[in-house]
Amino acid sequence: MIFSILEHILTHISFSVVLIVMTIYFLTLLVNLDESIGFYDSSDKGIVITFFSITGFLFTRWIYSGHFPLSNLYESLIFLSWAFSIIHMVSYFNKKKKNNLNAITAPSAIFIQGFATSGLLNKMPQSAILVPALQSQWLMMHVSMMVLGYGALLCGSLLSIALLVITFRKVGPFFYKKNKKKTKLLTDFFSFGVLYYINERNSIFLRQNINLSFSRNYYRYQLIEQLDYWSYRIISLGFLFLTMGILSGAVWANETWGSYWNWDPKETWAFITWTIFAIYLHIKTKKNGRGINSAIVASIGFLVIWICYFGVNLLGIGLHSYGSFTSN
């Protein structure tokens, strides 16, 4: 009873803090640069609080249930939200490269946690005895690597989608108008790391009366470079986790079912996901692999990940059916 109450409290704390963080972030779009710095510091600290709240929830559930909390969809969703907070923590402590990845991590975390605690999964929050197939030491290794991989790949793919939006968006006078608040409103939403730099450079360019067409291209180039930089590194990390998850899952499958690979729906879509992001990384090794081509592949991968993670669970068939919506 005590553990259930503690889980409930920690879950709601993390959800509330993420909601506040996202609200603070969007409030910064309405204030000028000097006033927004304090808001950004607060939102960063909020993500840290969220990280420790979810960590406490996972440990509490682990102690209460007696097994690593990754046995059903509800627990994996909470773990995925935790993965997004880790991504933000890494960028938060990277002082050399200022960025605002909470533009991706905060909305993603609140969406995932909101879905996990919604009525669709009202039966799953109750901890249950593991089914025989999950009673293995490989549970922690395999599922944690897969979910961490999903989180990193989703985050990197969203950055690639933002890159495409910036690249193909028509440049209008509104985007580069001298009104700082309007300029900040658009650049802040897509910059994820060059907010301070762009606004400061914008003021310098306007004071020096540098050709407007040059400054437009300069701002767009800076945004695209930063988005490409972070998406490549985060996707590379996610691909590593995904590879480790697939390999450990193959070993586990051989121990449980007597075969390394069975081409069940989950395995098939995991392989498709791995292939798409392998193509992405291959494109990035080419001289012309930066920018649009790789971003398009990553955007396709974003959809494939959700099919692999949720679509297969909707079917509730195959060897991984215990993670479906209908499973308790």
Curated annotation (Swiss-Prot):
GO terms for biological process: cytochrome complex assembly. Pfam families: Cytochrom_C_asm (PF01578). The chain crosses the membrane at residues 13-33, 46-66, 73-93, 101-121, 146-166, 234-254, 263-283, 295-315. InterPro entries: Cyt_c_assembly, Cyt_c_biogenesis_CcsA, Cyt_c_biogenesis_CcsA/CcmC. The keyword Glycosyltransferase does not apply. Required during biogenesis of c-type cytochromes (cytochrome c6 and cytochrome f) at the step of heme attachment. NCBIfam families: cytochr_II_ccsB. This is Cytochrome c biogenesis protein CcsA. The lineage of its organism: Eukaryota, Viridiplantae, Streptophyta, Embryophyta, Tracheophyta.
